[in-house]
Amino acid sequence: MEAVLLLAKLPEAFSVFSPIVDVMPVIPLFFLALAFVWQAAVGFK
């Protein structure tokens, strides 16, 4: 029973990280953009 109560309180505990979780799907797009910027910097060799 205590484990169930602990699991019920987990979403409240992690509510602080919700902005980070909202941004996470966009992170691979930043890496893709970084690859293009890097290739533009080296002249697309």
Swiss-Prot record:
GO CC list: photosystem II reaction center; plasma membrane-derived thylakoid membrane
Subunit structure: PSII is composed of 1 copy each of membrane proteins PsbA, PsbB, PsbC, PsbD, PsbE, PsbF, PsbH, PsbI, PsbJ, PsbK, PsbL, PsbM, PsbT, PsbX, PsbY, PsbZ, Psb30/Ycf12, peripheral proteins PsbO, CyanoQ (PsbQ), PsbU, PsbV and a large number of cofactors. It forms dimeric complexes.
Keyword Transmembrane listed: yes
Pfam families the UniProt entry points to: PsbK
Protein name: Photosystem II reaction center protein K
Family in the record: Belongs to the PsbK family.
Location in the cell: Cellular thylakoid membrane
Topology within the bilayer: Single-pass membrane protein
Known role: One of the components of the core complex of photosystem II (PSII). PSII is a light-driven water:plastoquinone oxidoreductase that uses light energy to abstract electrons from H(2)O, generating O(2) and a proton gradient subsequently used for ATP formation. It consists of a core antenna complex that captures photons, and an electron transfer chain that converts photonic excitation into a charge separation.
Taxonomic source organism: Acaryochloris marina (strain MBIC 11017)
Main location: membrane
Entry keywords, A to Z: Membrane, Photosynthesis, Photosystem II, Reaction center, Thylakoid, Transmembrane, Transmembrane helix
HAMAP family in alphabetical order: PSII_PsbK
Propeptide: 1-8
Membrane-spanning parts: 24-44
Domain of life: Bacteria
GO annotation terms (biological process): photosynthesis
Keyword set includes Transmembrane helix: yes
